Swiss-Prot record:
One of its GO terms (biological process) is sucrose biosynthetic process. This is Sucrose-phosphate synthase 1. Pathway: Glycan biosynthesis; sucrose biosynthesis; sucrose from D-fructose 6-phosphate and UDP-alpha-D-glucose: step 1/2. Residues 95-117 have a biased composition (Basic and acidic residues). It comes from Arabidopsis thaliana (Mouse-ear cress).
Length: 1043
């Protein structure tokens, strides 16, 4: 074909580069972000196969074959064409598979929606069809009215006066990148971009709002020699931009702060993809900080009662995952901002066909990221988005969010009608803000730069000279692009559009502010590849004197760069392939710059509000050059766009953003640890004289005895009377207190466990948690005994306590201990049913061996589906039995005798016939049922518990309620375990992996991501030991025992 000649010329040009480019030292592909390894042939494939069908490629191959010779050149050409042809076929095959996958997903979504709607049988007329505006959170109980929109300074003052009585404590979390309050190194790497600026400015703005006492922005402490020392400072105060109005509210600990929590490698700055194994460590450190700060604020402004966060706000998937765990541990509301979504990224990469799903996951840890986002949807009260596009086209890709079902649920909530255990987070569009107080749009032009003798001007900012030195004619309008050198920012297409449009080149200059660099060789491979491509294009089109690309700029220089472009009557351009929001567009508009922006993503919403420029297809060079030329050449259009931007920019101010943000937060139903309102001071010293009295208070505040120890686990009927429950608790307290008063003094001396202080676990110097998952009862018993025997000395002294953590019920635990000759009093606490129940050893054997902590249930019951969830699970089990059972054999059955109010247990006869745990989680999420599904005991049992319940979260609860130091816990696990196994191996606690125990990994065979993506076995907190001889040595190695 005539149009195919360039293919061979391109191939030959690549071959001329030489074979040395094929090795791993070469720069990565321009078009792929963070690709890793690069070969010229793959680069060619990326450029060709998306635009030519296989007929064209086949003809190129025929051409190569026709000129075959013994020479290496033609052999390589032939092989290359074969590879291209094969990849083109693979691309088509992938497209077919992708179409099938999307069709299957659509059917699953429709089926789930039908089943959910069928359960919710009440009919509504228009309520479930329209997008009803309601400020009730999706959890559903709050009825606070929404505050009116503020459109003037007068109404803002009125709103501020109404908020002065509030003393809110807010926590923001953003984990990756380098975060500091001043001189942010935006563009230094792909992790330090717009999100960093957004979270810092949001924290600063919230800290200046009336009614907000303190804001903490939690991030990672980085003490690496590769970064500035400031990133290793534990705390940094964010100075308000303008605090005169609210200075009277400032207190000792008030304001906004960056708090850096140490986690991960201490002396190494690592990319976000490698942070996943270390997130539990952050959760434990952040939990400790928040509890400490809550108590401090309580002493200052809370009349001695802790001031719990009004909300914890996670940013991006990693922080969202951490925030979900913190929300559960502290029982406070969660917010989420996704910024960039993993499922959307996966869809784009699969659509390109350049990487397999396995390669994508290996590079980006994309499946772990998606699971973090799904968990965040399970837990979040509200998801804040920048644009409507993010909701309609990105969040709807997730199992946990369905816009249609969300509207149905919201309509039911508004009418106080049951949702049958279904919950959906509320999606709220709140565009990011900006501080405009100190921005003065430049009204002059380039002729005014030098000033005159009568009206001297202030010296030009140094960055102006740094940019203008590149230009042979600095008087021309300046087209400004400000983005890091990342393939998705599409800078090379911009340079091509500029270089190929002669009229544009004659009328304007191009300034590319692409982050900071010292040397190209010192940049990341992706960034250096983009920059080298830009430089080659400048040379190709001979753009010397017309394009600026300075090496350095400070964050404080950015406003001056905008002013320079506006002074030259230039244009700001954002040509990104897709832009989640586009904060730089708002900044540019505030400085009087019209915009040309991508039509994909957030710029569409910004343009709708500002009406200050043109939208373009980022893949269309001609469209980009025409839009730029139109704005630069038409002065009337330029002036109109400038004026529109300045007129409408106030709608993106930080006060407006924060007002909407705070109005939403204050509409939430308050959530915080319940016991704190009645028996504060739980974390006092364990030897305090008030301990004995507090024990009785604790019992009266939702601690119930299991009187017979027979395993009657259905102790709290959701339909039952609260008065019955209250009378039983009061009777238990009377019996317990009578028994205590009548005890002889000698009985108190038996051991410290029964010294009258409850629970005994509070007084231990360190805690051993036995979390061995069942391979067989005998093996588990033997390993448990060996662990107990290894610390016999410390056990006798009372310095060590034991917790048994298991998927069994409390009655099964008792039978298990008795069968092995163990006494329940050997343990201080029991975490049962995979973390849905927490029991303590009873102080009085006459009342039964166990006490259940009811406050733990109130702590984990958030979004528990109850009877609606139970019915759905039974329906799922029935459908499975109908499909796969032989001879009427039931594969999965509900075990009523093992189930409790917060754990639905199913027994499994044929584990191989049951879908993987991820499939059941997916099915429930599609129906808006939020829960934690745990496959246990080698797949023979399924426990379905509240979404915020787990064995590791139960340990965090012990820290929150009783002050038990997580760093003083040693969790014993096997080599594998239940599907919640990964949660037990990360965090501040120590982990001992027993060799040869729980070796079967059948439950982990169909994981979405490998365990190595989420567990750091090289951590100093994880050791391996043999249950026969190394247990004590392992505890010494973890520094919990001394010689």
């Amino acid at each position: 074909m005539a149009g195919n000649d360039w293919v061979n010329s391109y191939l030959e040009a690549i071959l001329d580069v030489g074979q040395g480019l094929d090795d791993a030292r070469s720069s990565p592909s321009l078009l792929l972000r963070e690709r890793g390894r690069f070969t010229p042939s793959r680069y060619f494939v990326e450029e060709v196969i998306t635009g030519y069908d296989e007929t064209d490629l086949h003809r190129s191959w025929v051409k190569a074959v026709a000129t075959r010779s013994p020479q290496e050149r033609n052999t390589r050409l032939e092989n290359m064409c074969w590879r291209i042809w094969n990849l083109a076929r693979q691309k088509k095959q992938h497209e077919e598979k992708e179409a099938q996958r999307l069709a299957k997903r659509r059917l699953e979504r429709e089926k789930g929606r039908r089943e959910a709607t069928a359960d919710m049988s009440e009919e509504f007329s228009e309520g479930e069809k329209g997008d009803i505006i309601s400020d009730i959170s999706t959890h559903g109980e709050s009825t606070k009215p929404r505050l009116p929109r503020i459109n003037s300074a007068e109404s803002m003052e009125l709103w501020a006066s109404q908020q002065k009585g509030n003393k809110l404590y807010l926590v923001l979390i953003s984990l990756h990148g380098l975060i500091r309050g001043e001189n942010m190194e935006l563009g230094r790497d792909s992790d330090t971009g717009g999100q960093v600026k957004y979270v810092v400015e949001l924290a600063r703005a919230l800290g200046s709002m009336p009614g907000v006492y303190r804001v903490d922005l939690l991030t990672r402490q980085v003490s690496s020699p590769d970064v500035d020392y400031s990133y290793g400072e534990p705390t940094e105060m964010l100075t308000p931009r303008d605090s005169e109005d609210f200075s009277d509210e400032m207190g000792e600990s008030s304001g906004a702060y960056i708090v850096r929590i140490p986690f991960g490698p201490k002396d190494k700055y690592i990319p976000k993809e490698l942070l996943w194994p270390h997130i539990p460590e952050f959760v434990d450190g952040a939990m400790s900080h928040i509890m400490q700060m809550s108590n401090v604020l309580g002493e200052q402004v809370g009349v001695g009662k802790p001031i719990w966060p009004s909300a914890i706000h996670g940013h991006y998937a990693d922080a969202g995952d951490a925030t979900a765990l913190l929300s559960g541990a502290l029982n406070v509301p969660m917010l989420l901002t996704g910024h960039s979504l993993g499922r959307d990224k996966l869809e784009q990469l699969l659509r390109q066909g350049r990487l397999s799903k396995e390669e994508i996951n290996s590079t980006y840890k994309i499946m772990r990221r998606i699971e973090g986002e799904e968990l965040s949807l399970d837990v979040s009260e509200m998801v804040i988005t920048s644009t409507r596009q993010e909701i309609d086209e990105q969040w709807r890709l997730y199992d946990g969010f369905d816009p249609i079902l969300e509207r149905k649920l919201r309509a039911r909530i508004k009418r106080n009608v049951s949702c049958y255990g279904r919950f959906m987070p509320r999606m709220v569009k709140i565009p990011p803000g900006m501080e405009f107080n100190h921005i003065v749009p430049h009204g002059g032009d380039m002729e005014d730069t030098d000033g005159n003798e009568e009206h001297p001007t202030s010296p030009d900012p140094p960055i102006w000279a740094e940019i203008m030195r590149f230009f042979s004619n600095s008087r021309k309008p300046m087209i400004l692009a400000l983005a890091r050198p990342d393939p998705k920012k599409n800078i090379t297409t911009l340079v091509k559009a500029f270089g190929e449009c002669r009229p544009l080149r004659e009328l304007a200059n191009l300034a590319l502010i692409m982050g900071n660099r010292d040397g190209i060789d010192e940049m990341s491979s992706t960034s250096s590849s983009v920059l080298l491509s830009v430089l080659k294009l400048i040379d190709k089109y001979d753009l010397y004197g017309q394009v600026a690309y300075p090496k350095h700029h400070k964050q404080s220089d950015v406003p001056d760069i905008y002013r320079l472009a506006a002074k030259s009557k230039g244009v700001f351009i954002n040509p990104a392939i897709i832009e989640p929001f586009g904060l730089t567009l708002i900044e540019a508009a505030a400085h009087g710059l019209p915009m040309v922006a991508t039509k994909n993503g957030g710029p569409v919403d910004i343009h709708r509000v500002l009406d200050n420029g043109l939208l373009v297809d980022p893949h269309d060079q001609q469209s980009i050059s025409e839009a730029l030329l139109k704005l630069v050449a038409d002065k009337h259009l330029w002036a109109k766009c400038r004026q529109n931007g300045l007129k409408n920019i106030h709608q993106f101010s930080w006060p407006e953003h924060c007002k909407t943000y705070l109005s939403r937060i204050t509409s939430f139903k308050p959530r915080h640890p319940q016991w704190q309102s009645d028996d504060g001071g739980d974390n006092s010293e364990p030897e305090s004289p008030s301990d004995s009295l507090r024990d009785i208070q604790d019992i009266s505040l939702n601690l119930k005895f299991s009187f017979d120890g027979s395993g009657n686990d259905n102790y709290m009927n959701q339909e039952g009377s609260s008065m019955d429950r209250k009378s039983k608790i009061e009777a238990a307290v009377q019996n317990w207190s009578k028994g205590k008063d009548s005890r002889k003094m000698g009985s108190l001396e038996r051991s410290e466990v029964n010294s009258g202080k409850f629970p005994a676990v509070r007084r231990r110097k360190f805690i051993v948690v036995i979390a061995l998952d069942f391979d067989g009862e005998e093996d588990t018993l033997e390993a448990t005994k060996r662990i107990l025997d290894a610390v016999e000395k410390e056990r006798a002294e009372g310095s060590v306590g034991f917790i048994l953590s298991t998927s069994l019920t409390i009655s099964e635990v008792q039978s298990f201990l008795v069968s092995g000759g163990l006494n329940p009093n050997d343990f201080d606490a029991f975490i049962c049913n995979s973390g849905s129940d927490l029991h303590y050893t009873s102080l009085n054997n006459e009342d039964g061996p166990f006490v259940v902590d009811f406050y733990y249930h109130s702590h984990i019951e958030y979004r528990w589906g109850g009877e609606g969830l139970r019915k759905t699970l039974i329906r799922w089990a029935s459908s499975l039995n109908e499909k796969k059972a032989d001879n009427d054999e039931q594969i999965v059955t509900l075990a009523e005798h093992l189930s409790t109010d917060y754990c639905y247990t199913f027994t499994v006869k044929k584990p191989a016939a049951v879908p993987p745990v991820r499939e059941l989680r997916k099915l429930l999420r599609i129906q808006a049922l939020r829960c934690h599904v745990v496959y246990s005991q080698n797949g023979t049992r399924i426990n379905v518990i509240p979404v915020l319940a787990s064995r590791i979260q139960a340990l965090r609860y012990l820290f929150v309620r009783w002050g038990i130091d997580m760093a003083k816990m040693a969790v014993f696990v096997g080599e594998s375990g239940d599907t919640d196994y990964e949660g037990l191996l990360g965090g501040l606690h120590k982990s001992v992996v027993l060799k040869g125990v729980s070796c079967s990994a059948c439950l982990h065979a169909n994981r979405s991501y490998p365990l190595t993506d989420v567990i750091s076995f090289e951590s100093n907190n994880v050791v391996h030991a043999s249950p026969d001889s190394d247990v004590r040595d392992a505890l010494k190695k973890l520094e919990l025992l001394k010689d």
